[in-house]
């Protein structure tokens, strides 16, 4: 699903809202999440998951085409951890027992 499809679905479920307003709301939510992450904050949507940023330290890498060693600079990357309710919905019938044993 892409952003425009999300806007269409939300607008269809909320016929009292203008399509333009739904698009503005979706954009505002995404902008706020992006701004929070850029500021180094964590964004938690209870039951859905949490967005955060993680540091990838600099390292020595390899150019796959030439095999030459290259320096890869340190960078910050977005990270998403799923919430319990989302995991349960994606895996119906699972009882939340994470020990790997069968019931």
From Swiss-Prot:
Keyword DNA-binding attached: yes
SMART domains: BHL (SM00411)
Record's keyword terms, sorted: DNA recombination, DNA-binding, Transcription, Transcription regulation, Translation regulation
A GO MF label: structural constituent of chromatin
Highest taxon in the source lineage: Bacteria
One GO cellular component term noted in the UniProt record for this chain: cytosol
UniProt GO BP: DNA recombination; regulation of DNA-templated transcription; regulation of translation
Pfam family, one: Bac_DNA_binding
Protein family membership: Belongs to the bacterial histone-like protein family.
UniProt xrefs under NCBIfam families: hip (TIGR00988), PRK00199.1 (NF001222)
Described purpose of this protein according to its UniProt entry: This protein is one of the two subunits of integration host factor, a specific DNA-binding protein that functions in genetic recombination as well as in transcriptional and translational control.
Subunit structure: Heterodimer of an alpha and a beta chain.
Name of the featured protein: Integration host factor subunit beta
Organism of derivation: Sinorhizobium medicae (strain WSM419)
């Amino acid at each position: 699903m892409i952003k425009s499809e999300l806007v269409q679905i939300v607008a269809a479920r909320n016929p009292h809202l203008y399509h333009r307003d739904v698009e503005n709301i979706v954009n505002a939510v995404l902008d706020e999440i992006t701004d929070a992450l850029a500021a180094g904050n964590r964004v938690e949507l209870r039951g859905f998951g949490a967005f955060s940023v993680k540091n990838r330290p600099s390292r020595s890498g390899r150019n796959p085409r030439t095999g030459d060693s290259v320096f890869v600079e340190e960078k910050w990357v977005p990270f998403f951890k799923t919430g319990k309710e989302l995991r349960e919905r994606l895996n119906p019938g699972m009882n939340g027992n994470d020990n790997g044993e069968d019931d």
